[in-house]
Amino acid sequence: SKIKAAQAAGLKPILCVGETLQEREAGKASDVISGQIRAGLEGNGNTTGLVVAYEPIWAIGTGQSATPETAVEIMGGAILETLRSLHGSAADGISLLYGGSMNAGNAGEYAAQACIHGGLVGGAALQADSFLQVAAAVAAAKA
């Protein structure tokens, strides 16, 4: 798999998972995301350096983001449960990032959640000042 190849090359792979708005509204988000994780990690028992990012497809480039509660529901639920079913207690060492339109205004709310270890920042990272504000908000929430 690409994840396995990246690890073998000494890279820190990021497996991005997320659902469409239609999948979310149909109540299938958890199943879709669990399937994405299983497909992405199939045949790979190595969790070294692995990062999983939850990036709801419906939030990419829209300025919309999942509520922190929704992010926790997916990340602390479907993602962590699937990782634990595949890797047991080693799953607790996998970094979980939120990546759905994180910005300086909402980064602290996400980072304050125990199951969210950081952010996969897109548009807000294009300008140094904006990115530094995101980093400061995350650092303050994790302090």
What are these regions (language model features)?
Residues 1-143:
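Active-site loop-to-helix "anion-binding N-cap" substructures in soluble metabolic enzymes
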